[in-house]
Amino acid sequence: MRPSNRTPAQTRPITITRQFTAHAEGSVLVEFGETKVLCTASFTEGVPRFLKGQGQGWVTAEYGMLPRSTHSRMDREAARGKQSGRTQEIQRLIGRALRACVDMKALGENTIVIDCDVIQADGGTRTASITGACVALVDALNWARGKGIIKSNPLKFLIAAVSVGIYKGEAISDLEYIEDSAAETDMNVVMTETGKIIEIQGTAEGEPFTHEELIELLGLAKNSIREIVDVQKAALN
């Protein structure tokens, strides 16, 4: 039995609120149960130096957690003077995932920076960030098209992400913190709206997992991501 009484395949209630802030070209509050992340997309003309003159754009991401997003306060990374390895890993994951769904040539020499700020953490912050960031990205691209900065839609497809794992010997989807911290296997999966895999991060925390369990976890992730994409589409419509 899961602590929340959810079935193994059941995700937490998922909410996506668009236009959550006033200034960003795209802004979304995404909620996976008690995990809440603010995702903003900022569109700027021009690209990093390494891409100048190549006729293509760039999408990148930054990730951070507010000091009291967790049970006890943690120092801001800015106050410590450097980002943790975890933060760097997560923001690179978010950036890679988002670049997979954008036609960089159609974006032109423009840059979109996605900022994912965790307001409240209860497991799955990186997968919630990717899910919300995709919707914020869509809004930023639509803003640029409306302004005539880009001519065609660079979005190739929607993407979403979910955590899956083995908890007390059972494969489950969308782990909350109490499950994540005790899981035998923890995995983050990013997929397209049609179920193609963009990235898998999987670790055996307590017990090695079998090939059969891997396939079961990927099946759980695929079904959950299909449901999450439906939430994205409903928000965008």
UniProtKB/Swiss-Prot annotation:
Reaction catalysis annotation: tRNA(n+1) + phosphate = tRNA(n) + a ribonucleoside 5'-diphosphate
UniProtKB keywords: Nucleotidyltransferase, RNA-binding, rRNA processing, Transferase, tRNA processing, tRNA-binding
Pfam families: RNase_PH, RNase_PH_C
InterPro entries assigned to the protein according to its UniProt record, in alphabetical order: ExoRNase_PH_dom1, ExoRNase_PH_dom2, ExoRNase_PH_dom2_sf, PNPase/RNase_PH_dom_sf, Ribosomal_Su5_D2-typ_SF, RNase_PH, RNase_PH_bac-type, RNase_PH_CS
The EC number(s) this enzyme carries: 2.7.7.56
Annotated binding of phosphate, by residue: 86, 124-126
Stored Gene3D superfamilies: GHMP Kinase, N-terminal domain (3.30.230.70)
Top EC class, one word: transferase
Signal peptide: none
Keyword Transmembrane helix: no
Organism domain of life: Bacteria
GO molecular function terms attached to this record: 3'-5'-RNA exonuclease activity; tRNA binding; tRNA nucleotidyltransferase activity
The UniProt record lists the keyword tRNA processing: yes
PANTHER family noted in UniProt: EXOSOME COMPLEX COMPONENT (PTHR11953), EXOSOME COMPLEX COMPONENT RRP41 (PTHR11953:SF0)
NCBIfam families per the UniProt record, alphabetical: RNasePH (TIGR01966)
Family: Belongs to the RNase PH family.
Purpose of the protein: Phosphorolytic 3'-5' exoribonuclease that plays an important role in tRNA 3'-end maturation. Removes nucleotide residues following the 3'-CCA terminus of tRNAs; can also add nucleotides to the ends of RNA molecules by using nucleoside diphosphates as substrates, but this may not be physiologically important. Probably plays a role in initiation of 16S rRNA degradation (leading to ribosome degradation) during starvation.
Protein name, as recorded: Ribonuclease PH
Lineage, opening ranks: Bacteria, Pseudomonadati, Pseudomonadota, Gammaproteobacteria, Alteromonadales
